[in-house]
Amino acid sequence: DTDEGERWLCPDGSGYYGRLYSERRSGFRLTVFCRDFETPAWFRRSVMYQIFPDRFAFSDDDTASRGIEYHKSLGQTPELHKSLDEPVRYWPREFETSYSPDDFYGGTLRGIESKLPYLKELGVTCLYLNPIVEARSNHRYDSSDYLKVDPILGTNEDFTHLCVTARGMGIRIMLDGVYSHTGADSVYFNLYGAYPDTGACQGTQSPYYSWYDFRHFPDDYRCWWGFKDLPEVNERNGAWQDFVVSGEDSVVKTWLRRGASGWRLDVADELPDDTLALIR
């Protein structure tokens, strides 16, 4: 509904944003599914609200600033904006040869929790959070530590408290699992030596070495869409599957125990079908 009457946003075959029309356009949808495919009962007919944690809500404490200092202690160069009015930085700084998405606005898990009454009033029954685990970037699709909330957002305990409070209001929490690749600056790959354990690129004796596909060790490795900061993993590797999916203390099971109700899988189309079945 607009001042000029109804407008319909419809796809136009370009693959981009589509076009606005003054009348409803005819179209079609082809949906193919297995009749016996089961989805969680709580998710059916749920009202989902997506949150990008860094930009949603803030807490009246020093969580974000302490998290920034933690990342600096790893040799990283994050920036914390003073207000939401400041523009997003999308260009390289003087000391960089390429853009690094590491400017933050300071949203936190406690900030999200403070907005739960508002979200409940909207009728939300499921919160889908973009990645919350420790990572170098503000989007956090370059996981550094799968088992730890990014300190800029808070703590693992903050996450559990958020889930408990949300569940009491009839709201479930869904997490974003990024499992086709890790960050190069991570516990697992450790390209810059920021973490104490031996990462895959630091030696073949690393417990994570078998996760990755090195064509020529240590500099030439398979990476997601050619981005060297996103080394791809072998999702059929037994050690990886045990750590992330099937082990008693796996990443998937740990976050469910902490209070998450389900997972959205990043680039699920790039994960092997048998790995998807294992996760389910």
Regions found by a protein language model. Name each.
Residues 1-48, 58-83:
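The feature marks proteins involved in alpha-glucan
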Residues 22-29, 122, 207-210, 269:
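Short linear motifs at secondary-structure transitions and domain/linker junctions
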Residues 48-51, 265:
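Active-site regions of oxyanion-processing enzymes, predominantly non-cytosolic
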Residues 52-125, 132-258, 279:
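Substrate-binding/active-site clefts of carbohydrate-active enzymes
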Residues 128, 174, 264-266:
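Conserved beta-strand positions in the central sheet of alpha/beta enzyme cores
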Residues 261-264, 270:
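Conserved, well-ordered alpha-helix/loop/beta-strand core segments that scaffold catalytic motifs
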Residues 268-274, 279-280:
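Aromatic- and carboxylate-enriched substrate-binding clefts and catalytic-loop regions
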